[in-house]
């Protein structure tokens, strides 16, 4: 799995952002780490294309 920076906030949904060769995940406070990892794994192809 691609390493990522996690930013927790009051938002209601998960979001992925690619910026400067980094993967940034924005997640609600209440989201478990396992759910975040599943979300990142499910978008691995998109992340790889974006970082290529």
Where are these regions (language model features)?
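Active-site-proximal or metal-binding-adjacent scaffold patches in catalytic folds
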Residues: 1-52
């Amino acid at each position: 799995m691609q390493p990522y920076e996690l930013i927790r906030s009051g938002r209601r949904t998960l979001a992925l952002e690619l910026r400067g060769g980094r993967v940034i995940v924005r997640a609600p406070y209440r989201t478990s780490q396992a759910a975040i990892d599943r979300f990142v794994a499910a978008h691995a192809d998109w992340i790889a294309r974006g970082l290529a």
